[in-house]
Swiss-Prot record:
Involved in regulation of intracellular signaling pathways during development. Negatively regulates the Nodal signaling pathway, possibly by promoting the lysosomal degradation of Nodal receptors, such as TGFBR1. May be involved in control of the morphogenetic behavior of kidney ureteric bud cells by keeping cells epithelial and restraining their mesenchymal character. May play an inhibitory role in the re-epithelialization of skin wounds by attenuating TGF-beta signaling. The gene is Dact2. GO terms for molecular function: beta-catenin binding; delta-catenin binding; protein kinase A binding; protein kinase C binding; transcription factor binding. Residues 645-656 have a biased composition (Polar residues). GO terms for biological process: epithelial cell morphogenesis; hematopoietic progenitor cell differentiation; inner medullary collecting duct development; negative regulation of cell adhesion; negative regulation of nodal signaling pathway; skin development. It comes from Mus musculus (Mouse). This is Dapper homolog 2.
């Protein structure tokens, strides 16, 4: 059945075009056979019932015409009095002996309408009714005379039906003279077929009364009905061609869900569609590869088809080669067995109608791809165990909520034993490795190309399992965390005045980090929150584009990760205008900071000991306190492109401001609590101390912080200052020392309005 052709794409094209042409011919023959069978069915149905429909319609039309005739005759009988009056007027006209022939000829030459005489001027400009009557009356035969033939001659109603139509009022006023009536009847009998009178008068235009003149009365509708039945039953007699037995079987779709039965229009269209083509044995193939299309297979088709698979050996070898290049090997036989036609070992579909072709091989290739993906996931988990700190640095700032002392952090990342899911058990090994090496080292491994890592499923699948027991997980190590925060504050604050180089701070962060996963506290403060994930501090100074690290104030029920955590570049671009404003403010602050540091360098050194004797009570947790802490912490955590010494000068300026505020007692009364002045003394230190106290209280008596809606993430700085704890952001103060004093004399609402500018 296949035409001999060479190998290669040209031979494939010739074979495909030939198969499509043969399929189209078979589809057309099938459609012709279907039409012949349908015509035979219609003839049989019409022979059983002798067409009552058209005859009934004809009877209805005849009844309607009869009713119209009766109505017209009744109207004419009602107008009998008018007719006699008009007859009398016509007699008066004849007595006046007018020139009837001349006026009638002029009227007919000018206008064929019978009412034109009303407006015709004759006899020295006198218009009269006699003139109008004379215009339609003549000694010869007028077409108006035929309108009264059914009234006076009811036996000839059928012969004069051509002229029996509605007339105008003046047309019915002509008297019926007896010699003209006989002449009229004779002429009508001579011209009854055409309905036109033999004379010099032109016929009237067709009106509603000319229905029966146009349509033949007896034969018209009956002929139409018989012609319709004849044309329906006649048809084109097409001999039933011998169809190719290859196409005389049901077609099954590739998925086995659609079945096209053989003698059906859908089957014929599917055969001649360009989406299908037929190889030697299989009736129908979908397009699956360029050389050949995969199958809509017949039900009774044999499953071993060596020729199509032998054709597609090169394509399958190409697919195998591609898959081998990608490192995902197919669990199939060698190419020689696939080309040899030994395809019966593949398990058939449950429908039992599939034949082996490229689609099955591709399905198995897809299954192998899925298996390769599973293996790839396992290998990724193994590689994650080898490079544990890499996944920790990438995924920990994203999956764990960063609000301190309020929300349990992710047990997956920290390897908590209370949650017994398998992803968490897989995540415990990287954390044990993390305790043995520095945490900042994987940022060099990741480099600038690696985004924040969150593709692995265990990075946040078991966060929902950790939601069930947040209080139990919180209360475990809150006291240890509070002591640790106090120690860090005492270590960190004296360095601000000394303006140490950034490298010792970097080393201190590196030394403190490895012990944190083993303490297991839920209120763990992320040490890398100030840095972009996957980048080191040296890289952030090399690349001028600042990244945003999301410090999310998450809610207690769920742990949503902000989209800016996954796309820090977009978030950095969004907040570029705000950063420009901050740079403008910080240039002013830098000037004031330099002046304050030259005049009073001392208070920043003596600052950590002043809040030790006060401000340690639980009163420090009120809401205005949060506003004040936030103001100081926002001043401290603003992104800056300056060096670390400018930053320490800026902190000394804040310390001066808070020390000068200690003398003003009315500020605390304005804010409504006694601890606001204590907070303003040591802004960054007091805020951290309060965080430690809040963690101790929360470990004993439940949740201590009020619920704050999620705010915008803070910007990651480009300098190497040690990271600060994220606190709820309420307002922001960026002003000099004198301006801060003036601003704080206002109410808190006015403070918010003025500082948001």
């Amino acid at each position: 059945m296949w035409a001999p052709s060479g190998q290669g794409p040209a031979g494939w094209d010739r074979r495909r075009v030939g198969a499509r042409l043969r399929a189209a011919l078979a589809g057309l023959q099938e459609l012709q056979g279907l039409r012949a069978t349908q015509q035979a069915r219609v003839r049989g149905a019409l022979g059983l019932h002798p067409a009552p429909g058209p005859r009934g319609q004809e009877l209805r039309l005849e009844a309607a015409l009869t009713a119209l005739r009766e109505q017209l005759s009744r109207l004419r009988r009602q107008d009998a009095g008018l007719k006699t009056h008009l007859d009398q007027l016509d007699q008066q006209i004849s007595e006046l002996q007018l020139d009837v022939s001349r006026s009638s000829c002029e009227a007919l030459d000018s206008d064929s309408r019978p009412s034109s005489g009303f407006y015709e001027l004759s006899d020295a400009g006198s218009c009269s009714l006699s003139t109008s009557c004379a215009s339609v009356c003549s000694d010869r035969l007028s077409p108006s005379l035929g309108s009264w033939l059914p009234v006076f001659q009811p036996s000839k109603s059928r012969s004069g039906i051509g002229d029996w139509r509605p007339r105008s009022a003046d047309e019915t006023t002509v008297p019926a003279w007896s010699p003209q009536l006989t002449e009229d009847s004779r002429l009508l009998h001579g011209a009854e077929g055409t309905g036109r009178l033999t004379g010099m008068f032109r016929p009237r235009p067709v009106s509603t009364g000319d229905l029966e003149r146009v349509l033949p009365a007896d034969v018209g509708l009956q002929r139409a009905g018989t012609d319709a039945a004849h044309l329906l039953g006649q048809g084109i007699e097409i001999p039933a061609h011998a169809l190719d037995p290859t196409y005389q079987r049901d077609l099954v779709a590739r998925g086995g869900q659609e079945v096209y039965p053989y003698p059906s229009p859908l089957h014929a269209v599917a055969l001649q569609s360009p989406l299908f083509a037929l190889p030697k044995e299989a009736p129908c193939f979908d397009i699956c590869s360029p050389p050949q299309e995969p199958p809509l297979v017949p039900v009774d088709e044999n499953r071993t088809q060596p020729e199509p698979i032998r054709e597609l050996g090169s394509a399958e070898a190409y697919i195998h080669r591609l898959l081998h290049l990608r490192g995902q090997e197919l669990p199939l036989r060698d190419v020689g067995q696939e080309q040899g036609g030994d395809t019966a070992a593949f398990p058939p579909k449950p429908c039992g109608q599939r034949s082996e072709s490229t689609c099955q091989l591709e399905k198995q290739a897809c299954g192998a791809d899925r298996g390769g993906l599973k293996l790839g996931r396992g290998a990724a988990k193994d590689s994650l165990k080898q490079h544990g700190p890499v996944s920790l640095v990438g995924a920990e700032p994203l999956s764990s909520p960063l609000k301190e002392e309020t929300i349990p952090w992710n047990p997956c990342v920290h390897g908590d034993n209370t949650v017994g899911s398998s992803p968490c058990s897989q995540a415990q090994q990287p954390l044990n490795d993390c305790g043995q090496g520095p945490v900042l080292s994987p940022s060099r491994v990741l480099g600038t190309e690696s985004p924040p890592l969150a593709p692995e499923p265990f990075a946040y699948t078991s966060c929902t399992t950790g939601e069930t027991s947040p209080v139990k997980l919180r209360m475990g190590f809150s006291q240890n965390k509070a002591v640790k925060v106090r120690r860090r504050v005492s270590e960190k604050v004296p360095r601000l005045g000394k303006q140490l180089p950034p490298q010792p701070e970097r080393q201190r962060v590196t030394e403190r980090d490895p012990s944190r996963p083993h303490q297991g506290g839920l209120s763990r403060r992320p040490t890398l929150a100030r840095e972009p994930p996957g980048r080191s501090c040296s890289e952030s100074t090399l690349y001028p584009v600042p990244f945003l690290v999301p410090v999310v104030v998450a809610q207690r029920e769920s742990y949503p990760t902000s989209p800016q955590a996954f796309f820090p570049m977009e978030a950095a671009l969004l907040s570029s205008a705000a950063r420009r404003k901050q740079r403008r403010w910080q240039s002013t602050m830098e000037i004031s900071a330099k002046a304050g540091s030259v005049s009073q360098p001392g208070p920043s050194m003596g600052l950590p000991r002043s809040p030790a004797k006060r401000g340690s009570g639980p009163r420090a947790q009120s809401r205005p306190t949060l506003a004040r802490q936030d103001a100081c912490a926002r001043c401290e955590s603003d992104p800056s492109e300056h060096s670390a010494d400018c930053t320490s000068l800026y902190h000394s300026t804040i310390a001066e401001t808070s020390e000068d505020e200690e003398a003003s007692d009315h500020t605390a009364n304005r804010f409504g609590d006694e601890s606001s002045s204590n907070d303003s003394e040591g802004c960054f230190r007091g805020s951290r101390r309060r965080l430690a106290i809040g963690s101790a209280e929360a470990g004993q008596g439940g949740w201590a912080w009020p619920r704050v809606p999620p705010q915008q993430p803070s910007r990651a700085p480009g300098n190497t200052r040690p990271p600060l704890p994220p606190v709820p952001k309420l307002c922001r103060i960026k002003a000099s020392k004198a301006l801060k004093k003036k601003i704080r004399r206002f109410q808190p609402a006015a403070l918010k309005v003025m500082t948001m500018v």
